[in-house]
C-alpha cells in the first residue's frame, strides 16, 4: 500500500534511529488495527513512536526506567502498553498478520492442521503466578504455543511451569477451535500423552491429536522430528527477543502481551521483506 504525505504526517514516520523502528511497509500492515486517537483532551503521543519504544524494549530487554531519552517518557509508553494489552490489540494484530502471511505463501487464510509445544522459562523476583517444572528443573512459567504447518502462531497461552503439558492441551485446542474452526488435526510430542487428557481435549475442540514420538531414545538432546520441527523453529525465533529470555512480569496478562508483541514484530518483518522482494 503506497504512502502519501498525509499518511506520513498522521503517523509521523521518520527516518529510523534504531534497527527495531517500524518501517513504512511494516506500519502499513497494522495501521488499520491501531486504535484511533480520542477527539477530546490532550493530543496523545504518536502511536508509531510508542511502537518503536516497545519494539526496542523487546529486542534489548531494557527496563522501563532505562528507556532511551529519545523515546517518550517511560510512563507514557507504559500506560499505552497497558491500554493495548487490556484491549487485546496484540492478539488481533497477530491473527491478521498470520492470515496475510499464509495467503502470501499461497495457502488458505485459515489452517486445517496445527502443531503444539511448550517452553518453560525462568521468572524473576517480580512475583506473580509461577511453579516448578520437574522435568526441566525450571522454576517459573510455561509458554504454550500452537502453530500451523508453516510455523506461524495460531494460539499462545502462559501458565505456571508446574502445569503439565497434557493438562494445558484442552484449553489450548478449545481456543484454537473457537478462533479457527477449520482446524481438524494436531501434532504433539510425548509430553501430551494420556488418554483422559486427550479425550478432554478432543471433546473441547473436536480436533484429533497425533503424538509424534522420538524413534531413538538413546540419543540425548534435541532431535528434529517430522511434523514437529516447525514449532521448535518458532520457539527459536522467539528467543531473538531478549525481553523474553526470562519472564520479568508480575502478571501473566503482561507476559502474554509481550509474547504476542514479539510474534507480531517477527511477522511484520517477515511480511514486509516478502513484499519488498516481490516489488
Indicate residue ranges for each PLM-predicted region.
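Short alpha-helical elements
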Residues: 1-279
Amino acid at each position: 500500500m503506497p504512502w502519501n504525505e498525509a499518511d506520513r504526517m498522521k503517523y509521523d514516520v521518520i527516518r529510523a534511529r534504531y534497527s527495531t523502528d517500524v518501517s513504512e511497509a511494516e506500519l502499513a500492515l497494522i495501521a488499520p488495527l491501531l486504535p484511533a486517537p480520542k477527539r477530546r483532551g490532550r493530543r496523545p503521543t504518536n502511536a508509531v513512536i510508542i511502537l518503536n519504544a516497545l519494539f526496542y524494549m523487546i529486542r534489548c530487554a531494557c527496563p522501563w526506567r532505562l528507556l532511551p531519552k529519545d523515546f517518550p517518557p517511560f510512563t507514557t509508553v507504559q500506560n499505552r502498553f497497558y491500554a493495548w494489552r487490556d484491549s487485546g490489540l496484540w492478539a488481533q494484530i497477530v491473527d491478521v498478520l498470520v492470515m496475510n502471511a499464509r495467503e502470501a505463501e499461497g495457502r488458505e487464510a485459515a489452517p486445517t492442521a496445527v502443531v503444539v509445544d511448550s517452553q518453560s522459562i525462568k521468572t524473576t523476583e517480580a512475583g506473580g503466578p509461577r511453579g516448578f517444572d520437574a522435568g526441566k528443573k525450571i522454576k517459573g512459567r510455561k509458554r504454550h504455543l500452537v502453530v500451523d504447518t508453516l510455523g506461524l502462531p495460531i494460539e499462545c497461552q502462559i501458565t505456571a511451569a508446574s502445569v503439565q503439558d497434557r493438562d494445558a492441551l484442552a484449553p489450548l485446542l478449545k481456543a484454537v477451535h473457537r478462533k479457527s474452526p477449520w482446524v481438524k488435526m494436531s501434532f504433539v510430542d510425548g509430553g501430551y500423552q494420556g488418554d483422559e487428557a486427550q479425550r478432554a481435549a478432543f471433546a473441547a475442540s473436536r480436533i484429533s491429536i497425533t503424538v509424534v514420538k522420538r524413534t531413538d531414545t538413546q540419543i540425548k538432546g534435541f532431535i528434529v522430528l517430522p511434523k514437529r520441527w516447525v514449532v521448535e523453529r518458532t520457539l527459536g525465533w522467539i528467543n531473538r527477543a531478549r525481553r523474553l529470555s526470562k519472564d520479568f512480569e508480575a502478571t501473566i496478562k503482561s507476559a502474554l502481551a509481550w509474547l504476542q508483541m514479539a510474534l507480531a514484530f517477527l511477522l511484520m518483518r517477515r511480511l514486509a521483506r516478502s513484499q519488498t522482494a516481490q516489488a
